[in-house]
């Protein structure tokens, strides 16, 4: 079935409404309409010459980027004038119809995968069972953040509201945030705890606009006792997302519900963050987590080894802790690599054994999408066409999800660009795949080690091709 011009423009409007401020969208975008699509040339009608000139000058690149992302093919956007455009313009219809009343359609291969009607899926905490207070190692770098998180978990809505955790990648912000959720659910199993990233919030907002279900979206996010929001820095520049989050924040805060936020920097350092949001993020407690010192790193490795049933000599722990100093994720990754290597090689666990594979981290070589494709295909024994195609066979589907996950985390490709690489898949499909792999990573140590093995092979390939 062909995708109609109406459907393309409606979907684009949903994305533009999230990206732009409400006044901008209402004044300039909502009054325009897609007139025709001929030879990959999309014509957009505006109600006046002034509006046409303004869109062309200020928003042409944004509109072009969005419609190409939605269509999955290169499009050229042109603006024309129609005095009836503002009269006929309507908000996105959301309903999906097989035919269009206007000229032009997209090939069936660019199907958008939209759902008709419905509401957001039932909320679930989605907390990693490993992220508890009992498994969190306290040190000088995180003592204040840990104490604040405990206070919030014990008395949500009364201690520090909001609690804003900030610090670099892999320092334990997500661990502490989810530990609050676990603590509260153990104390009160009926508590409504919701953990979400700002990226997920934005995508849910786009879906709500698309389905005309904003009321359901608001109930979904505002009917909670504790809202845990990760990666807040990604809200920067998203005007409508910030506006919706502002009202969600106010509703929860005024109701005495607990809000916990995490970002890689403090609120006032997040660029293009609305001043009113920055003010609210700062009205509770901002707790910074810094890189762990040598004693804390050694304690983290000991606890990790203890929980995973690993027997590590003291000098091995000291060597890893001395070699990897920047963050906990890197530290634990080194431990997993060392254990995997010893298990595969049959050699004894010693500094001499693991030293060759745990050299001090150097400047990483660029990993490309093609490298990831080659390594994943080799690992799973499948061909490139199958991986990049649409086969739903379980082994191919999982390999594809892993490849998408690796591209998201080890390349600079955006979600839409990754979708394009896999034959024009929607960015929500890519996001789902990444979340699925993250979930498997949390649930299975064996899967986590397999993933780490793939990453190591990627680094070897990247280094060999750059030398």
Swiss-Prot record:
Region (Domain IV, binds dsDNA): 343-467
Lineage, broadest ranks: Bacteria, Bacillati, Cyanobacteriota, Cyanophyceae, Synechococcales
Annotated organism of origin: Synechococcus sp. (strain JA-2-3B'a(2-13)) (Cyanobacteria bacterium Yellowstone B-Prime)
Entry annotated with the keyword ATP-binding: yes
Record SUPFAM superfamilies: P-loop containing nucleoside triphosphate hydrolases, TrpR-like
Residues reported to bind ATP: 170, 172-174
Region spans: Domain I, interacts with DnaA modulators: 1-84
Protein's cellular compartments: Cytoplasm
Protein name: Chromosomal replication initiator protein DnaA
Region (Domain II): 84-125
